[in-house]
Amino acid sequence: MFFQTGLLLSLSLWTKVAYAAFGITTSSSSYVIDAGSANPLKFTVSRSSCDITSINYSGTELQYASKGSHISSGLGRATVSATQDGDYIKVTCATSTLTHYMVVHHGDSTIHMATHITAEPSIGELRFIARLKSDVLPNEEPFGDVSTTAGGTAIEGSDVFLVNGKTRSKFYSSQRFIDDQRHCISGSAHRVCMILNQYESSSGGPFHRDIDANNGGGFNALYWYMNSGHVQTEPYRMGLHGPYSMVFSRSGMPGTNIDTSFFANLNIKGYVPASGRGTVTGKASGADSRMKWVVHWHNTAAQYWTYTASDGSFTSPAMKPGTYTMVYYQGEYKVAETSVTVRAGSKITKNISGSVKTGKTIFKIGEWDGQPTGFRNADKQLRMHPSDSRMAAWGPLTYTVGRSAPSDFPMAVFKSVNNPVTIKFTASAAQTAAATLRIGTTLSFAGGRPQAKINSYTAAAPPAPKNLDSRGVTRGAYRGLGEVYDVAIPAGTIVAGVNTITISVVSGNSGEKFLSPNFVFDCVELFQ
């Protein structure tokens, strides 16, 4: 009995000691941070480079041994310090243009981070990459092995691979920022998730997407891309990026509603607390009610967004003070734009209204939603290369109005693959007057844009769109600047009876197969 009592007392004391382990252990080369959590989290940070060189969670080493976890491709040299303030530990890594923070709260198996920049990193992108052991954490969530490239053969550049007959790429792990609050990698006994609650200093807007994960063999990479040149549509933002949180768990999926308001008390450069922010409330109206509506605010310093409720009402996230462009989308298609000024501590009311305006429709292929939804291969393009054997034949295709399905129309036209796309339609005598053919696109590559021919009339080629200088469709992207082209059709060009329209890719550039000039369709509408 005495032995059992003593054993229980010893275990109780041991447990208290284990929880009391919260703190910093300093050596000449590193800081070891112990979170003091029930499932123990202990990680090591290099004092010279800011690399995380070890992550031990619940008794298992998760960090890839040959290369650390870090900002960008590593800072190289940095001034690194670690301080403890009550229940919080803060690691600060500083260079002349970048300050990276790692924060641990006593008892939580989470590394909270934020990154402040005054200039873009020399590699041309700002990201955090956790390189974790692929034998312990082999799985990628939520999209599975579409981004597992281990054992593959490169088929495009150094980032698209063929693995067991299927195309894979790290780019196929992406999801839209507005929907990406959490992405993870996992194994049989561990899960590590990146929780993203603050995109205000990132670039690209609510529908931008970037790499989330990539199991390349030796390590499984878990990313948070704050900005990059991957189909980037706007300038990079400086200032504080984050907070963002790397959460460690056993089998459970962590929630996405993480409170990081304690950053306000930690002397984080550029952090704006709730008291220094304001909100915008209002009601959106007029757009197609079959689609989700999004309201988006942006200026050169920050960006925010929210879905509206079913009645169009909305409240913005807490925003930094400033004047913002305010945009209203049906799906991803812009239907209205205005401006609003936000002040600290205030709640501004601002309604917004808009709709798609065309004319009397003769035919419409697709919907004005800013996406290639429903078109051929649009259901697969996010997660595989257009050359993949699982793709339906690209054509060239002919779409007959009134008979063909949306899947008979290609999501994209490639100059060297399926050029042109043909549309056949029957017009009445009343429809032979002057008309407009509106061709909506979502993304252009290598200067690709549409040139239309209506029966014997060939419309002028439009000027080249802005060059985003980034592969798109082949890396799972469909959204760029969303150019819309109007073709004025003279009276008498359309005839009573059967008519033929061809839409071709024109560009002064060239390329092979799916890297030839191309564009992605949103919608095609003929109206008077």
Swiss-Prot record:
What domain of life does the UniProt record list for this protein's source? Eukaryota
Q: What is its EC number?
A: 4.2.2.23
Its lineage reads: Eukaryota, Fungi, Dikarya, Ascomycota, Pezizomycotina
The region annotated as signal peptide is 1-20
Q: Which residues are glycosylated?
A: N56, N351
* Broad class of where this protein is predominantly found: secreted
Protein's organism: Aspergillus clavatus (strain ATCC 1007 / CBS 513.65 / DSM 816 / NCTC 3887 / NRRL 1 / QM 1276 / 107)
Q: Which gene encodes it?
A: rglA
Keywords (alphabetical) are: Carbohydrate metabolism, Cell wall biogenesis/degradation, Disulfide bond, Glycoprotein, Lyase, Polysaccharide degradation, Secreted, Signal
| Compartment(s) of residence | Secreted
One cellular component GO annotation, for this chain's record?
Answer: extracellular region
Q: What is this protein called?
A: Probable rhamnogalacturonate lyase A
Give disulfide pairs as residue numbers: C50-C93, C184-C193
Its family remark reads: Belongs to the polysaccharide lyase 4 family.
